[in-house]
Amino acid sequence: MTQKACCAAIDAHARELIELSKKIWERPEMGWTEKNASAWTADYLKKQGFAVERGAYGMPTAIRAVWGKGAPVVGFCGEYDCLPGLSQKVCPDFEPVVPSGLGHGCGHNLLGVGCVAACLGL
């Protein structure tokens, strides 16, 4: 697959990927408790044809999604947890949604969805 084809595969899902990222942003969850983000991500991958294992590796919110067989094997590690005290509206200035609340100040709502995009691109 060429770079152009990979990018086109991702672009074809851009709207859905952006919506997934926004959904995770709007419902921040601390590490090990990301039940919604995990479920939404797993559901999306399953809808795209991946074989999805929820609660992978003994972690309740971990996902293992498999596509195809054989070699090479490529793995991605996505994150979707948030941190306390980083609640933020979608704007460039500091404007918490909830003062001292949970938020995605480190962009994990983007990192997890970025890994989903990379999977789709391959």
What is each residue range found by the language model?
Residues T2-H104, N109, V113-V116, L120-G121:
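Acidic/His- and Gly-rich active-site-bordering loop/insert found
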